[in-house]
């Protein structure tokens, strides 16, 4: 629970003391923050899934693995896929911010061009970040809608 409460930028600053200013620092911060959040979402999806299909598999002599495979997984898979796409969106947005503290990526480029007051390049980079983020948001939103629609079809 604690790891989910700590923003990725704070995680990156803590990791920075060990790994230095490298892209690995940013990737590790995103991974640590994402794993905690995604584990919670996975737990909640499985916990709130209807138990009827899994109980039916068990009643017909299925093993625990078969209960999960045929009873629980088909129910939670669309939600987990949707949540993974959402987390990917969050990671893309956060990676630009992490780059501002010097751990690589487009945020690192923004910092460099800002220091040299090359505002035209900064403007283009900001537009690129916004367009990429909006595109990922639109694409993953469409995929999530399809997944959810298929779940209820």
Language model features by range: what are they?
Residues 21-72, 78-87, 138-141:
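Membrane-cytosol interface at the C-terminal ends of specific transmembrane alpha-helices
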Residues 82, 123-153:
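C-terminal transmembrane helix and the adjacent membrane-cytosol boundary/short C-terminal tail
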Residues 13-17, 26, 83, 95-99, ...:
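Transmembrane alpha-helix boundary and packing residues in multipass membrane permease domains
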Residues 19-21, 101-104:
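Short helix-capping/hinge motifs at transmembrane helix termini and TM-loop junctions
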Residues 104-114:
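Short, membrane-exposed interhelical loops at transmembrane-helix boundaries
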Residues 1-31:
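Generic hydrophobic transmembrane alpha-helix motif, especially the helices
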Residues 5, 30-34, 75, 79, ...:
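Small-residue faces within membrane-embedded alpha-helices
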């Amino acid at each position: 629970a604690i790891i989910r409460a700590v923003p990725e930028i704070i995680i990156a600053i803590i990791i920075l003391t060990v790994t230095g200013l490298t892209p690995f620092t940013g990737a590790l911060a995103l991974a640590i923050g994402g794993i905690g959040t995604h584990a919670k979402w996975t737990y909640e999806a499985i916990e709130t899934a209807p138990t009827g299909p899994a109980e039916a598999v068990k009643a017909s002599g299925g093993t625990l693995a078969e209960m999960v495979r045929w009873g629980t997984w088909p129910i939670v898979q669309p939600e987990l896929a949707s949540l993974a796409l959402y987390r990917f969106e969050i990671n893309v947005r956060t990676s630009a911010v992490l780059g501002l503290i010097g751990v690589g990526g487009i945020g690192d480029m923004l910092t460099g061009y800002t220091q040299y007051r090359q505002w035209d390049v900064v403007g283009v980079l900001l537009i690129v970040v916004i367009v990429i983020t909006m595109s990922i948001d639109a694409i993953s939103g469409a995929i999530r809608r399809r997944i959810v629609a298929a779940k209820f079809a």
